[in-house]
Each structure stands twice: as structure tokens, then as C-alpha cells.
């Protein structure tokens, strides 16, 4: 008949929210590993599970880590963290400046300020 049909296939990513949710689940249950060096070379030959008590061989899609992250709530000059003690936070925020997140469960003091200024109002 002279007509033809064309099919085009491509790979698409899942919705961004789904990717974020899956990454968060993996972040909450990571597996600590340590590199084991090969005898003849200095390169790591494989990764060994660090915590044998909770042994669970990580799957290729699991999140693994080599060392624990520093505690940024406390001052630690070794890693360059000044800590969060004494910093201002936003009591009504749900972001990174929120008091719940920034104060690391230590609690916080609230201060109320009143500011008076002339607004050049005309009646």
C-alpha cells in the first residue's frame, strides 16, 4: 500500500519523587563495608561487611559506606565542623534552618523582638 509505520523506543526515568523515596529508604538502611586488599597488589580486591552481627550481604542496589559520617551537631575541628550550638534557627520552618533539625534534640530558647520604625504613612 506504500505506507509504513515507525516505532521509536526510549528509556525514561521514573518520577523524581519515586527516585527520592527509594534513595531515602536505602539511606536509612546502609551496610558498612571495608576494603580488603589483595595480597599481591595494593588495590582493594573486594569489600567485606564490617558488622558481622547484623550480617546481610549487600545487593548491588543496596547503599554501602566505608566510614560513619561526622556528627555535625557537635563541634569537631578535625573535620571542620563548628557545631550548631548558639546558632539561630527558625521555629516555624520545616527546612534545614528549623530548630528541630538544627538543635539536634538539645532544645532551644525563644526570643521575641519588637521593632518600631517610621513608615512615612499619609492619612
Swiss-Prot record:
GO CC terms of this entry: extracellular space
Subcellular location: Secreted, Extracellular space, Extracellular matrix
Residue positions the entry lists as glycosylated: 90
Annotated GO biological process: canonical Wnt signaling pathway; cell fate commitment; neuron differentiation; positive regulation of JNK cascade
Keyword Glycoprotein tagged: yes
Annotated S-S bridges: 89-104
InterPro entries recorded: Wnt, Wnt_C
Annotated GO MF terms: cytokine activity; frizzled binding
Covalently attached lipid (O-palmitoleoyl serine), positions: 1
Post-translational modification remark: Palmitoleoylation is required for efficient binding to frizzled receptors. Depalmitoleoylation leads to Wnt signaling pathway inhibition.
Entry keyword set: Developmental protein, Disulfide bond, Extracellular matrix, Glycoprotein, Lipoprotein, Secreted, Wnt signaling pathway
Family note: Belongs to the Wnt family.
Record PANTHER family: PROTEIN WNT-2 (PTHR12027:SF112), WNT RELATED (PTHR12027)
Function of the molecule: Ligand for members of the frizzled family of seven transmembrane receptors. Probable developmental protein. May be a signaling molecule which affects the development of discrete regions of tissues. Is likely to signal over only few cell diameters.
Name this protein carries in UniProt: Protein Wnt-7
Source organism per UniProt: Evasterias troschelii (Mottled sea star)
Lineage: Eukaryota, Metazoa, Echinodermata, Eleutherozoa, Asterozoa
